[in-house]
Amino acid sequence: MSRIGKNPVPIPEKVSVEISGLTVKVKGPKGELERVLPDGVSVSQADNAVTVSPSDTSRRSRERHGLCRTLVANMVEGVSKGFSKKLEIIGVGYRAQVKGKKLVVSAGYSHPVEMDAPEGVTFAVENNTLVTVSGADKELVGNEAAKVRGIRPPEPYKGKGIKYQGERILRKAGKTGKK
């Protein structure tokens, strides 16, 4: 039995949860999310809380118990508060800007790299070097932030590239010349 899965997910005000079988729909001020949970768990709602429990004692359902509880908790938090990830762009001439729903990144290539924001995700840029990816779906926000970082990952010698805010880059010493 999962320790995380035992805790019920509290539902804040202005958030509504609909459960039909293994499909969970969550609506709130930041948007609406829907997810189909895997087999082996049962979901119920009572007293402004959602409870996830394993449907049987098999290993697979016990493994998925904590996962499903966390997925529901992230959906509730996403539609009430939202999620965001910040990325720093480091390097001479490296910059970003938003054009409509597109993020345009100049990262040392011969052409600027354009990224479309998927449904439910927004890009914001401060000072041309700080990109904020925000939205209600934690998984989608994390994937889009990883795609932005993947345009030019930080390199270990000078630290140039796109990194998450607060990420530590392992630095290496350069070659030592002949003496």
Curated annotation (Swiss-Prot):
GO terms for biological process: cytoplasmic translation. Belongs to the universal ribosomal protein uL6 family. Coiled coil: none annotated. The keyword Phosphoprotein does not apply. It comes from Synechococcus sp. (strain RCC307). This protein binds to the 23S rRNA, and is important in its secondary structure. It is located near the subunit interface in the base of the L7/L12 stalk, and near the tRNA binding site of the peptidyltransferase center. SUPFAM superfamilies: Ribosomal protein L6. Keywords: Ribonucleoprotein, Ribosomal protein, RNA-binding, rRNA-binding. One of its GO terms (molecular function) is structural constituent of ribosome. Part of the 50S ribosomal subunit. This is Large ribosomal subunit protein uL6. GO terms for cellular component: cytosolic large ribosomal subunit.
